[in-house]
C-alpha cells in the first residue's frame, strides 16, 4: 500500500481518550527494543514518525496513528523491560488489557518478534493473551537481515513452535533495513481492514 499520509492523532492512557469513529484499527505490540518502531516507520515510509528510543520501556501510552485517513495503527508500549517498576508494570497491564478487551474498532494485532532469537516468555504470554481474546494476530519476524538467508526457515520454525502459532495467523519475515516483507505485511494487514474500506 502506498502511504501518502500518516499522522499521530493522540497518545492515550484511558478509553475516553481513544479516537472516535469506526475506522479499523491494527494494534502493534512487541518486546521493548525489538524493532517495533523501526517496523512502523518502514511500513509507513517515514524515517522518524515513531521515535526510536535508546531507552527501553520509554513509550508508556497507546499512540494512535491515522494512516491515509483509512485506518489507525495503535502503537502499544513495549513489554518485558526489567527496569520498569511493579507499579508501572501493573498500570501498563491494565491499560493494555482495557484496550484489547473493550475496543470494538480493533481488527487485528501485529506482534513483532526478533527472528534471531527464540521468542521470550513475555512474547509467548503476549501471544497467548491475544489468542485468549480471539484477536487475529500477524507475527512480524524482524531483523531477518541480521542472519544468513539459508537460516531463515530454521529460525522461523523456532518462532512458530515456541509461540505455538494458530493455523490462521500469518508469520511475515521482515527487515527494517532492506524492506523485506513490507508488501507481505501490508497484504496480511489488509485482510483484516479491507472489508471496512471496500
UniProtKB/Swiss-Prot annotation:
Needed cofactors: Mg(2+)
Natural source organism: Bacillus anthracis
Molecular function terms from GO: GTP binding; metal ion binding
Gene Ontology CC: one annotated term: cytosol
Keywords from the named record: Cell cycle, Cell division, GTP-binding, Magnesium, Metal-binding, Nucleotide-binding, Septation
UniProt KW Nucleotide-binding keyword: yes
NCBIfam families (alphabetical): GTPase_YsxC (TIGR03598), small_GTP (TIGR00231)
Family membership noted in the UniProt record: Belongs to the TRAFAC class TrmE-Era-EngA-EngB-Septin-like GTPase superfamily. EngB GTPase family.
Name this protein carries in UniProt: Probable GTP-binding protein EngB
Transmembrane segments: none
Function: Necessary for normal cell division and for the maintenance of normal septation.
Domain EngB-type G span(s) in chain numbering: 22-195
InterPro entries: G_ENGB_dom (IPR030393), GTP-bd (IPR006073), GTP-bd_ribosome_bio_YsxC (IPR019987), P-loop_NTPase (IPR027417), Small_GTP-bd (IPR005225)
Residues annotated for Mg(2+) binding in this entry: 37, 59
Amino acid at each position: 500500500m502506498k502511504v501518502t499520509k500518516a499522522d499521530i492523532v493522540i497518545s492515550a492512557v484511558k478509553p475516553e481518550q481513544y479516537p472516535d469513529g469506526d475506522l479499523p484499527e491494527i494494534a502493534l505490540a512487541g518486546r521493548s527494543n525489538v524493532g517495533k518502531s523501526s517496523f512502523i516507520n518502514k511500513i509507513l515510509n517515514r524515517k522518524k514518525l515513531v521515535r526510536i528510543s535508546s531507552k527501553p520501556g520509554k513509550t508508556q501510552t497507546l499512540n494512535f496513528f491515522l494512516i491515509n485517513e483509512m485506518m489507525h495503527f495503535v502503537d502499544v508500549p513495549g513489554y518485558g523491560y526489567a527496569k520498569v517498576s511493579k507499579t508501572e508494570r501493573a498500570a501498563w497491564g491494565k491499560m493494555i488489557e482495557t484496550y484489547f478487551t473493550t475496543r470494538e474498532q480493533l481488527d487485528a494485532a501485529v506482534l513483532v518478534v526478533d527472528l534471531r532469537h527464540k521468542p521470550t516468555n513475555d512474547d509467548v504470554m503476549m501471544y497467548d493473551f491475544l489468542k485468549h481474546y480471539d484477536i487475529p494476530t500477524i507475527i512480524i519476524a524482524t531483523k531477518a537481515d541480521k542472519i544468513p538467508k539459508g537460516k531463515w526457515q530454521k529460525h522461523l520454525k523456532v518462532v512458530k513452535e515456541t509461540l505455538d502459532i494458530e493455523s490462521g495467523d500469518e508469520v511475515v519475515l521482515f527487515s527494517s533495513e532492506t524492506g523485506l516483507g513490507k508488501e507481505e505485511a501490508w497484504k496480511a494487514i489488509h485482510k483484516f481492514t479491507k472489508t471496512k474500506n471496500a
